[in-house]
A protein has these predicted regions:
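Extracytoplasmic copper-binding redox domains, predominantly the cupredoxin/blue-copper superfamily
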Residues: 25-191
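Bacterial N-terminal signal peptides that target proteins for export
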Residues: 2-11
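Bacterial N-terminal signal peptides
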Residues: 10-21
Length: 191
């Protein structure tokens, strides 16, 4: 038989109440932390460069295209021909094309293609810094001017297998494109 005196009972009750209060505070703090935890959204850069034809070109050089996908390949000639006719290769793409995120979300852009890309914020979509890849009549937009000699463009370059973090986007619409392959475009809506 257990005998508790009034002081011991009071002490036990007080400990239980204190423990319950601590648990409630901890749970509320955890829920608040989860609500305010920074979130991320991923964008993937894709391409289907053919290593044999891209790397054989003396202007590009060996090791440029590191495509390891099992999908179809596009030769360099095919890519240039499609761009010249205003029908860019859909294998070069950012996914998703449109993204809705909350303010405070960090974009993580991952290059899962075989060649370098940029993820450059632009005022409006337009031509990149390689005229041969621009649609007929499309001119290089200011944000892409100068290519990699422009530090602002160079900072947005992503190499095969690497990633780029884009934190702190303000509310509203943000447009991004690849300054090399200007048909690779993403619209990000920040709420």
């Amino acid at each position: 038989m257990i005998r508790l005196s009034i002081p011991r009972f009071g002490l036990l009750a007080g400990c239980l109440l204190f423990g319950g209060a601590l648990q409630a505070i901890a749970q509320e703090t955890n829920e608040h932390a989860q609500e305010n935890a920074p979130s991320v959204a991923q964008i993937v850069a894709l391409d289907e460069c053919d290593p044999a034809t891209f790397n054989a070109n003396p202007l590009i050089g060996p090791g440029f295209c590191k495509n390891v996908t099992l999908g179809a390949f596009t030769t360099l000639t095919e890519l240039l021909d499609k761009a010249a006719h205003g029908t860019p290769d859909p294998g070069w793409d950012f996914e998703p094309d449109v993204l809705h995120i909350k303010k405070g979300t960090t974009l993580v852009v991952v290059d899962q293609g075989g060649e370098p890309h940029t993820f450059t914020e632009v005022e409006k979509f337009g031509g990149g810094f390689l005229p041969v890849l621009n649609a007929p009549g499309e001119v290089t937009i200011p944000e892409c001017a100068g290519g990699f000699k422009n530090v602002a463009v160079a900072k947005t370059r992503i190499l095969q297998g690497s990633q780029l973090l884009v934190p702190g986007l303000s509310k509203g619409e943000h447009l991004f494109e690849c300054c090399i392959h200007p048909w690779m475009r993403v619209k990000v809506e920040v709420k």
